[in-house]
Curated annotation (Swiss-Prot):
This is DEAD-box ATP-dependent RNA helicase 50. InterPro entries: DEAD/DEAH_box_helicase_dom, Helicase_ATP-bd, Helicase_C-like, P-loop_NTPase, RNA_helicase_DEAD_Q_motif. The gene is RH50. Residues 79-88, 275-286 have a biased composition (Low complexity). The Q motif is unique to and characteristic of the DEAD box family of RNA helicases and controls ATP binding and hydrolysis. It comes from Arabidopsis thaliana.
């Protein structure tokens, strides 16, 4: 059995989806220019089957008819037969058997003779021009250099014989004639010249007189083109239709460009139908219709005539259902998108339009934008809970509260993420407490000594005290339940006594929680829900890994887990979805974003270019800037963030030297060097005081940025630039909190920090997140 030579290894061009750069389109329109048509880009990939080789049409590719393919160009045999053909080096070494060598030589000789004889007969009634003779000469020189024993001999002979058998007129004399396809990348100018030489064909008339042809006629002609034999019509009608499609796309004579220049003539259904029909077209129509639809879509997007872009500048024309439907289409993506990190088209970014609109609204409009359009009754709050919230002056839920209520009260594990000051504490407390109260009234569950029904883990004792204050406010307003805090710095005996009396909600830090679990004092057999507040900070605690493992191993399988955070970095998100793959992800509208009411000011403290750059000179420049801000913008409350405790103490000394008797300036330190009692006292004084004559300054480290709600803060000063962009969001988020909050942030930077801070502020001004957020499920509010 003789082995057949393998076919040549050809590539065919695949259409590239993009014909031009989007950023360049935007720049051209902003500068008053127009879109310049560019040649479509192509990528190449190897063919997988022999049949696909016959369908290839690129520079120098050969189109083989059915009869020729059966006779001269037979498809290759199976892989085992091809593997029996030795390489050229093996032939030189004589390692191949003599019988196979002789058989293979006779096979090639017979094939070559058959090809030469057939082509010689065909050449008698074929005309050739000078250009073809030059190509033949070049091919002869090239093939003469190759040895007959080369593995690519049939490939070279095919090209040579096929090029000699190609008539330039584009008209077929015989059905089985071997033709050469026109070059895909041939310029449009030459194609137009060719069309003019061939006369007023119907296809050319369609380009020059588009009004004479309806869309059905134009579509029918292109459909017939795609269904016809491309090998026979590639030089004639195929080229003319390619010109027609190019002119339709870039010169404005087609329906797609008319749709761009006259958008009012087309409704949304017609535009959607046209784009849907594009997706159903054959590959032969991709050159024309794809270009027209893509250009139309690009121009619609960047000129403001697309529905998505029009939604930004004309928000009143779109209802919440329409906007939610657009966002929901993103959430139905693949597993990769739901668990990955998205670009501008992720689910979370569907709400960016609301943020851009809010920046141009007045103060009163901005206040209403903080709350959801739904009421507490509409999201499912009970009468007792609504009464308790009403007493605390909560009339409507915030966005994150409305979004998280339904999955939390249903007992689903969730990741709840939104910006600082958005109301995340009540977003998980209200539904959890309501569910506990309903279960207690129905007799399904009840608190027992040493076994709380809800555990809240927080990173700091100050945040634990804040959560406890919220729990007691709800309890005193008509929804009774018991809550307590177990943290370091308090008498342990008192905490244990209260725990033995029975508690519904236990708030603890990871260290104290681990201690109670190891000592056997705390039991989790009755646990209904575990809440991890500021989970991104908890993962940075050395004791948290052990605390989380104890929590998972000791709690019932039916326990609910809630992970709450203002920032959700990639590594934290991956850890959560790996351990809890069934979590619902509730993303607020402003994750990783600063408040709309926040004003940011970049202060370059690098000094003069000729001055010496040292840490001491940088500190002196920051000191001068701080005193200048204090004198020119006197306010009631200011928080100053430093990276180190040592820097905090230096800043404290600056204020003490300015006002030793603290008649106008009152400084309150807040960092780990102080005892917990001192920190809580200073925090309480700073949050509850309303000074009228003097100004309060809280000098702190990042400990104060971890979830603590500082109400009424006017200014935030970043004396040291944060090491992490996520920390930037938490620091500046201490001001401009809530619906009516507003404030200013002054960022001191030196050296390379200037460029990084400028990019962050520019992104904030545009409403973009400081860094990406994951694609996730989202609930309509």
């Amino acid at each position: 059995m003789l082995a057949r030579a393998p076919p040549p290894y050809f590539n065919f061009p695949a259409r590239n989806n993009t014909i031009c750069n989007r950023n360049e389109i935007v720049r051209l329109f902003r500068n008053g220019g127009g879109v310049v048509a560019r040649g479509a880009g192509f990528t190449r990939r190897p063919l997988e089957t022999s049949s696909s080789y016959d369908d290839s049409t690129d520079d120098g590719f050969v189109i083989i008819s059915a009869a020729d393919k059966e006779n001269e160009f037979a498809p290759p045999p199976s892989s085992d037969l091809l593997s029996s053909i030795p390489s050229e080096s093996a032939r030189r070494n004589g390692s191949r058997s003599r019988g196979l060598t002789a058989s293979f030589g006779r096979l090639k000789a017979q094939k070559v003779k058959a090809l030469v004889g057939k082509v010689t007969q065909k050449k008698q009634h074929m005309s050739h021009n000078e250009e073809e003779d030059e190509d033949d000469a070049s091919d002869e020189n090239y093939s003469a250099d190759e040895g007959f024993g080369s593995s690519s001999i049939l490939d070279l002979m095919r090209k040579k014989l096929a090029m000699k058998a190609i008539p330039r007129s584009g008209k077929s004399a015989e059905r089985n004639e071997v033709k050469r396809a026109s070059k895909v990348r041939e310029s449009r100018e030459s194609r137009r010249d060719l069309d003019r030489l061939e006369g007023d064909d119907e296809d050319v008339d369609e380009v020059s007189n588009p009004d004479r042809f309806t869309d059905n006629q134009r579509a029918g002609s292109r459909s017939s083109y795609s269904k016809g034999g491309y090998a026979a019509n590639s030089r004639g009608k195929g080229d003319r239709l390619s010109v027609a499609r190019d002119l339709d796309s870039f010169e404005g004579h087609g329906r797609a460009i008319d749709e761009v220049s006259n958008p009012r003539k087309f409704n949304d259904n017609e535009r959607a139908e046209s784009r849907s029909s594009y997706s159903r077209d054959s590959s032969a129509n991709s050159r024309g219709r794809e270009d027209r639809r893509f250009v139309a879509k690009e121009l619609d997007t960047f000129q403001g005539r697309d529905k998505a872009y029009d939604e930004v500048y004309n928000p009143r024309r779109f209802t919440d259902n329409e906007r939610g439907l657009r966002g929901g289409s993103h959430s139905k993506g693949s597993d990769t998108n739901s668990r990955g990190w998205g670009d501008r088209r992720s689910v979370v970014y569907t709400r960016d339009m609301d943020d851009w609109r809010e920046r141009n609204k007045t103060k009163d409009t901005r206040e209403t934008g903080f709350f959801s359009r739904k009421t507490f009754a509409e999201i499912g709050c009970s009468e007792d809970m609504m009464k308790a919230l009403k007493e605390q002056n909560f009339d409507r839920p915030a966005h994150i509260q409305a979004m998280a209520f339904s999955p939390v009260i249903d007992g689903k594990s969730c990741i709840i993420a939104d910006q600082s000051g958005s109301g995340k504490t009540l977003a998980y407390l209200v539904p959890v407490i309501q569910r506990l109260r309903e279960e207690e009234l129905q007799g399904h569950s009840k608190s027992s000594p040493g076994c709380p029904r809800v555990i809240v883990l927080v990173p700091t004792a100050e945040l634990a005290s804040q959560v406890l204050a919220n729990c007691r406010s709800i309890s005193k307003s008509g929804v009774p339940f018991r809550s307590m805090v177990v943290t370091g710095g308090f008498r342990q005996r008192t905490q244990l006594e209260n725990l033995e009396q029975g508690v519904d909600v236990l708030i603890a830090t990871p260290g104290r929680f681990t201690y109670l679990m190891n000592e056997g004092i705390l039991g989790l057999s009755n646990l209904r829900c575990a809440i991890l507040d500021e989970v991104d900070i908890l993962f940075g605690d050395d004791e948290f890994e052990a605390a989380l493992q104890n929590l998972i191993n000791s709690s019932p399988v039916t326990a609910q887990y809630l992970f709450v955070t203002a920032t959700l970095p990639l590594e934290i998100y991956n850890k959560l979805v790996e351990v809890f793959p069934d979590c619902e992800v509730v993303m607020g509208p402003r994750v990783h974003r600063v408040s709309n009411a926040l004003e940011e000011f970049l202060v370059d403290c690098s000094g003069d270019d000729n001055a010496e750059k040292t840490p001491e000179t940088a500190f002196q420049n920051k000191k001068t800037a701080l005193l200048q801000i204090m004198e020119e913008n006197p306010v009631s409350k200011t928080i100053i963030f430093c990276n180190k405790i040592e820097t905090c103490r230096k800043v404290e000394n600056i204020f003490k030297r300015v006002d030793r008797k603290e008649r106008q300036l009152h400084v309150l330190p807040f960092h780990a060097a102080l005892s917990q009692e001192s920190r809580l006292t200073n925090m309480q004084e700073f949050t509850s005081s309303q000074p009228e004559e003097n100004s309060l300054f809280l000098v702190c480290t990042d400990r104060a940025s971890r979830g603590i709600d500082f109400s009424g803060v006017d200014h935030v000063v970043l004396f040291d630039f944060p090491r992490d962009p996520s920390e930037y969001v938490r620091r500046v988020g201490r001001t401009a909190r809530g619906a009516r909050g507003k404030g200013k942030a002054f960022i001191f930077v030196v050296g390379k920090q200037v460029g990084l801070a400028r990019r962050i502020i520019e992104r904030n001004e545009k409403g973009h997140p400081v860094h990406d957020v994951p694609n996730a499920y989202e609930f309509t509010t």
